[in-house]
């Protein structure tokens, strides 16, 4: 396997949303990831950080929203999300410290 950057530079944070809680029941977890990370790097980073086996990785790039303020317009930063599905029989990831939904 190729050596990658520090896994904590690739996986930034878990996504906290209703969708991510619902996906946890299907053994799929959502994370904010570095915009330059590819699926292979994300898979290796998840396996190193959490000690689980990854079945598949899907990614989604989200453009930043245009927001208006009193002085004009600004743009929220764009994000990249990774939806990681674990292999059957793999242990669950406890990223929120409690029971799912």
UniProtKB/Swiss-Prot annotation:
Q: Which GO terms describe its biological process?
A: translation
Stored Gene3D superfamilies? 3.30.70.330
Q: Which GO terms describe its molecular function?
A: rRNA binding; structural constituent of ribosome
Q: Which UniProt keywords apply?
A: Ribonucleoprotein, Ribosomal protein, RNA-binding, rRNA-binding
Gene Ontology cellular-component terms for this entry are: ribonucleoprotein complex; ribosome
User: Cross-referenced HAMAP family, in alphabetical order?
Assistant: Ribosomal_uL23_B
The family this protein is said to belong to: Belongs to the universal ribosomal protein uL23 family.
What does the UniProt record say this protein does?
One of the early assembly proteins it binds 23S rRNA. One of the proteins that surrounds the polypeptide exit tunnel on the outside of the ribosome. Forms the main docking site for trigger factor binding to the ribosome.
Indicate the quaternary assembly: Part of the 50S ribosomal subunit. Contacts protein L29, and trigger factor when it is bound to the ribosome.
PANTHER family documented for this protein: 60S RIBOSOMAL PROTEIN L23A
This protein's name: Large ribosomal subunit protein uL23
Q: Which gene encodes it?
A: rplW
